[in-house]
Structure formats: C-alpha cells, structure tokens
Design a protein with these regions (language model features):
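C-terminal accessory extensions appended to soluble enzyme cores
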Residues: 265-301
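Short hydrophobic segments within beta-strands
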Residues: 29-31, 152
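Short, hydrophobic/amphipathic alpha-helical patches that form generic packing surfaces
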Residues: 252-267
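Bacterial N-terminal signal peptides
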Residues: 2-11
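Residues that mark the start of a beta-strand
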Residues: 25-27, 55
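Alpha-helical cap/lid subdomain in secreted, periplasmic
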Residues: 99-251, 263, 272
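Conserved SGNH/GDSL esterase-like catalytic core that processes O-acyl groups on lipids
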Residues: 37-133, 139
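Bacterial Sec-dependent signal peptides at the C-terminal "C-region" and cleavage site
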Residues: 10-24
Length: 301
C-alpha cells in the first residue's frame, strides 16, 4: 500500500494524512482539454490502489488554449448561464458528468490543487502563455485562493503529425521548445510542474522508441483505440500513411500519465502500485514507474 505524506501537496497542505481533511479526499480540478481528460480512466484507480482518497474533476473542451479559457471566463461574466465545458468528476470512485464554466467550477469546492496547461499546438510558443495564462492564474487565485496551482507539461507529437512539417521541426525539437516554454511560465508565476512531456521523452529515449514507416515503435503517443495492424494504410502511391490519431496518448500512455501525476502530486512509492491495465506489460509498467519516480526527484531536465 502506498502512502500520502508530502510531494507538491505537502507544501500547501501541511502533510495531510491519508484520511484527509475532507471526506471527499484531496480535491484536484483540471482546467484543460484532451491532454488532461485522459487522466480520468486511470488516475482515480491508481490513487485508490495507493490508499489516497481523491476527488478528481476535469473541465474539458477539445483543443482549448489558455486564450480560449480566458475568453470563456469573460463570456461567463456577462452570461451566467454560459457553461461551455464538459465536466467529468470522479469522487472516491463515484463518477458524474455535467456542464459548467470555469468560475462556477472554481467555487464548487475548496480545491486543493488546480491544474492548467497550454493547448498542445501552442505549447512550443512561449509568447502564447501570456497574457492569457497570467490572467487565468489571477482568476484562480481570486476564486480559489487556497488552491495550489500546478502546470502540466504536455508532450510532443509523433513524426506523422502534419503540423510538425508546417512548423519546420520534429518531435524532439518540439519537446525542447515546449519544455522551455512551460519552464519559463511556471518560473514566472511560481508554479510546480508535472513533467509529463519530459516523461514521454524519457520513454522514447529509454525504450527506445524506434519509428518505422508503418509503426509507432512502442511510443505512448499515437494509435489510440486501434490495433497495431490498423494504424497505417497504403495511399494511392502505395506509401504508408497514418490511419489513426498521431498526437494523443494511446491507452498505455494514459496509464503512464496517471503514474507521473501520482508521483508528482503525492509522496508515493510507485513500486507498490498494484493496479495495471491488461494492455500494459509488466516490463512497460516497470519502466513507466522508474521514469515517474526519477522525474519526481529531478523534474526539470
């Protein structure tokens, strides 16, 4: 059984015991998009396996940027009925859904942690974090002053994403750029970072991931909900082209993300985590846990 003692939360919560100060457990609100809602399948189960009571709530709009979040906040100021977000919540294993806006969500509970992130297609642009990210931080501090604001570092795409060609660089350079942008934003505002983009990069390096013309090579990004043999197809020129998602996490990636978040937010021994979905091998889970644990000690590489 894992234990909850410190980590990011201990700094603000004073080493809350596993029983928590609230019957709902540690309350985490994610103001995000498709790069955060993917935590809903596995993070509650990992937390339960660790004996950590968790109330996890996701605000989701696909591809939602920091600028759009703030546009929504301003729209809500003139229209209280404006509820553009899908809300998914898992409180001690009980799941609910609804519609909500950012301001109402921030006041819904006394959140212990509120997480934010940039939309992935802007994440490599440091200028995209300002002023909208700063404004969102100010709104969170206004409506949820007790909450610890934590930034999730998102990940770089696989080589098949056409946007990389448009931008003029590959996955590694995208990572270096977003890594620097998130680091600068977090430092400016005094936030902790969940280094999942770095975790994905470490996975690619240490597995190692070897892309081929018709394979993701073991990556945790790409090929979601598709069998390996269905991820690529021949085009009219008989060249292999992707036949699936090439930038979201696949199912294994979602489990990996849950482990990295668990290690970042709580003082847990991931080696003791018994929960593992059947599509993750023992060796894969071992490497995921090793990377997550190492990044907890040295999160910014």
């Amino acid at each position: 059984v894992c234990c909850l003692l410190s980590g990011i939360l201990a700094t603000v919560l004073g080493c809350k015991s596993s029983s928590g100060e609230d019957e709902k457990g540690t309350k985490v609100l994610m103001i995000g998009n498709s790069f955060s809602i993917c935590l809903m399948p596995h993070l509650p189960k990992v937390a339960e396996d660790c004996g950590v009571p968790l109330d996890l709530c996701s605000l989701y709009i696909g591809g939602c940027s920091l600028e759009r979040h703030m546009d929504n906040v301003r729209s809500n100021a003139v229209n209280a009925a404006f509820k553009p977000y899908r809300m998914d919540r898992c409180t001690l294993g009980e799941r609910t859904q609804g519609k909500i806006n950012v301001c109402d969500a921030l006041k819904l509970e006394a959140w212990d942690v509120v997480t934010i992130q940039q939309a992935s297609h802007y994440s490599w642009k440091p200028e995209s974090f300002h002023p909208h990210g700063d404004q969102l931080v100010a709104k969170i501090r206004e409506l949820a002053p007790q909450a610890k604001i934590v930034v999730q570092e998102t990940w770089s795409y696989t080589p098949w994403d056409k946007r990389l060609k448009e931008w003029g660089f590959g996955p590694d350079e995208m990572y270096e750029k977003l890594h620097a942008a998130y680091g600068a934003f977090a430092t400016k505002n005094g936030h902790s970072v969940i280094p999942f983009g770095t975790a994905v990069q470490e996975w690619r390096r240490r597995l190692p991931v070897t892309y081929t013309e018709n394979s993701f090579g073991g990556d945790v990004v790409g090929g979601r909900n598709r069998a390996k043999e269905d991820c690529f197809k021949r085009d009219a020129d008989y060249k292999w082209v992707p036949n699936c998602d090439v930038f979201h996490l696949n199912e294994r990636g979602e489990y990996f993300q849950a482990l990295v978040w668990m290690a970042s937010l709580f003082d847990v021994d991931l080696k003791e985590v018994g929960y593992k979905p059947p599509f993750v091998t023992d060796d894969e889970a071992k490497l995921m846990k090793e990377i997550a644990a190492e990044l907890k000690e040295t999160p910014r590489r």
